[in-house]
Amino acid sequence: MTEVKQYPGRDYDVIVVGAGHAGSEAALAAARMGNRTLLMTINLDMVAFMPCNPSVGGPAKGIVVREIDALGGEMGRNIDKTYVQMRMLNTGKGPAVRALRAQADKHAYHAEMKHTIEREPNLTLRQGIVDGLIVEDGVCKGVITNTGARYSAKSVVLTTGTAARGKIIIGELMYSSGPNNSQPAMKLSGDLERLGFNLERFKTGTPPRVDGNTIDYSVTEEQPGDPEPHHFSFETKDADYIDLKHQLSCWLTYTNETTHKIIRENLDRAPMFTGVIEGVGPRYCPSIEDKIVRFADKKRHQLFLEPEGRNTDEWYVQGLSTSMPEEVQQRILHSIKGLEDAEMMRPGYAIEYDVVAPYQLKATLETKLVKNLYTAGQTNGTSGYEEAAGQGLIAGINAGLRALDRGQFTLKRSDAYIGVMIDDLVTKGTNEPYRLLTSRAEYRLILRHDNADLRLTDKGRELGLIDDERYAAFEAKRQAIKNELDRLGKIRIKPNDEVNAFLRAHNSGELKDGVLAADFLKRPEVQYADLMKFIPAAPEPLERHVIEQVEIQIKYAGYIQKAEERVDRLKKMEAKKIPDRIDYDAIDGLATEAHQKLKKIQPTTIAQASRISGVNPADIAILSVYIQQGRIAKVQ
């Protein structure tokens, strides 16, 4: 075969490889910071595409979308423009686990994000496949495409998703492919291995799509959206919320014993169990055949029928991810209530792909092996659009900062769920597709859906990603919260017939002495609206998000204070830095596993070292003493 002749392409400040959810955020962030940015994608028709579930948000993930928005990212704005249904989850639980979820119009989501990218002044969007990196003396200086173009840059971000040596599997059928039958990237992985990177093989899957006209909705349970307005972005107005009658419902059905029997009888043809699939699959989103085997005692499993958009009849069968042969998939579908006559439009499939083992990354998402090279998204072993977008934003910010010769940006575990995710990846690594869960965050009471803007907008502003108008609106909100908290901390409520009648009606103890309005509001049965019956209203009408913050900050004050005290203790450990190029071989007394893990992961602080699996408190004590005594290897 004739070798493709290389030629010099344009020079850029930042190049982003891959335009999925990670790549889109990375490129927009870098460009908005003033960098001339190139965004390369295998297919222009798949920018920010949703090859799997047509939704954004959910537990932990919805909070990540709010964090992305607070930092100046795009996902929140984009889904607010393109959703077909919006629901707040876990409303019966505390604020720490509440999460917003939107059903997306997947085609509108792609089109809107592509349009946003095309309008960005510093950003060039181009179709092409990157086959290799330009690396000189351990520094990444650009990329080489399959057409021979050599584009140079000050920093490069890889967000290749599931395209890296992608392989689709449907029963006995296997072929090289990216997601949704797109072209795979077959050469870049080899180039990374040549540079010394350790790559792993992961697997994910997707369910069949069915024709919505052939679903019998009458025997399923409707799952409508919420009538009250919600949105992911600080910038979106309540007035823009789609009223309930114009939202699209999802529908709930279940597998049954017949479904399970069909699956069990065909396990000998299931790639998951025949050894065909080598990649490690996601623990928290298993295939239906995996669920039937692992949870053999369960009589049924939930399935949600979800619309893929307003202008398509394709419906997504959430919970039925599978790589079984096509004919078996059809039999499975027809065994399910409401899908007895469903026409399958696309079969489900599994896809294997390459992953950069994330212990090879810094908290900035720059690789330790190659300077100025960053990776984000499924490339780093995560699953989910939101996890990808969060990483993409951080990688794009840092690639942009590097191009501007400015210091790097990181988020701590106490700052954001994004910080929890990145710390988990770079400190612990992952042996399966990583999914964010509220249980992964030890400070989840202060990492809430409702306070993402209060936590992170200042940081977004410092990075140049929050404009003047938005920041002024944010400051007005923050000041309104402070003013009302101060006011409620000064006004007293005296016991009287009206107050005590209210308390008796709510089975609450009567007042014998006067109390501060803030203390009155701390009672579980008292809401802010109730409080306003007994005290004057605020001087200016308060927006509902201000009232929500006031109520949460007062009612959960004690718990929040305890969480903040734990954060302060963590900060002291984070302040204890581990010098670069420390020689762990020279430290006597470390346990063998701790020695191996510390040497492999190279933590930057004592706090990070303490979170590494296999490193125990005794090892941390030895390491701390070693550093305090100044017995460290010299930086070369």
Curated annotation (Swiss-Prot):
Indicate yes or no for the key word NAD: yes
UniProt-listed GO biological process terms: tRNA methylation; tRNA wobble uridine modification
Q: Which domain of life is it from?
A: Bacteria
Q: What is its main location?
A: cytoplasm
Q: Please give the cofactor(s) recorded in the UniProt entry for this protein.
A: FAD
**Which Gene Ontology terms of cellular component type are present?**
cytosol
Q: Which molecular function terms from Gene Ontology are attached?
A: flavin adenine dinucleotide binding
UniProt binding sites for FAD:
G18, A19, G20, H21, A22, G23
Residues holding NAD(+): 281-295
Role this protein plays? NAD-binding protein involved in the addition of a carboxymethylaminomethyl (cmnm) group at the wobble position (U34) of certain tRNAs, forming tRNA-cmnm(5)s(2)U34.
Q: Which family does it belong to?
A: Belongs to the MnmG family.
Q: Which PANTHER family match?
A: GLUCOSE INHIBITED DIVISION PROTEIN A, PROTEIN MTO1 HOMOLOG, MITOCHONDRIAL
According to UniProt, the name of this protein is tRNA uridine 5-carboxymethylaminomethyl modification enzyme MnmG
